[in-house]
Design a protein with these regions (language model features):
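Bacterial N-terminal signal peptides
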Residues: 9-18
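Bacterial N-terminal signal peptides that target proteins for export
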Residues: 1-10
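A "functional boundary" signal
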Residues: 21-191
Length: 191
């Protein structure tokens, strides 16, 4: 007994669903390794990322991931983020405007702008990052990070009441994230 499907559109839809469920994004192996190393061995992650000789052949998503990882590793090692500026611009174009990664790219872009003493743009980047992160209720680590940066930015402009408010919010989020290093930093900035 043969069953005929009268609508070829249904067949196409079923094929598309099957294929889309099986397709997975492949990540560059060095990026995966750098991600694993980042928290405990940021210096090794930075060296690994700097050893990637060319981004040619990487997908735009991998290039954007590379930008965020390199910025994070440079920041954790105390290096300037200025060399990451154009890569962060790429990441901002690749990630969806409501994605957590877009917010993280805005955070690091704000740090670049602050390093260049472009405080108005840095403030805008930080606020946009917080707006995006508000849709992610459990991202306490990144929220605390942004609030800490805002506190520093307000402090540089002698806006001490606003700086204090930001540091209090940073301490709150850092305590929820259970990230002692950030919590201690935010707490010392508050006092």
């Amino acid at each position: 007994m043969y069953v005929y499907i009268k609508q070829p559109g249904i067949v196409c839809l079923l094929c598309w669903l099957c294929l889309s469920c099986t397709l997975q994004r492949t990540e560059h192996p060095a990026l995966r390794q750098a991600g694993y190393l980042m928290e405990e061995h940021a210096d090794s992650a930075f060296s690994l990322l700097k050893s990637i000789s060319s981004l040619i052949g990487m997908t735009p998503e991998d290039k954007a991931d590379y930008a965020l990882l390199l910025a994070e590793a440079a920041d954790k090692n105390g290096y300037s983020l200025l060399p990451c500026d154009s890569l962060l611009n790429l990441a901002l174009h690749v990630y969806h405007e409501e994605a957590k990664e877009h917010a993280i790219a805005l955070l690091y872009k704000g740090k670049v702008q602050q390093e260049m003493e472009n405080y108005a743009d840095a403030l805008k980047s930080y606020r946009m990052a917080l707006e995006i992160l508000s849709a992610y209720p459990c991202e306490f680590y990144w929220k605390g990070f942004v609030y800490n940066m805002l506190g520093g930015l307000y402090g540089k402009q002698n806006l001490y009441a606003q700086a204090k408010d930001m540091y209090v919010k940073a301490c709150y989020n850092d305590s929820l994230a259970r990230h002692n290093r950030h919590f201690i930093s935010s707490l010392s900035n508050l006092g």
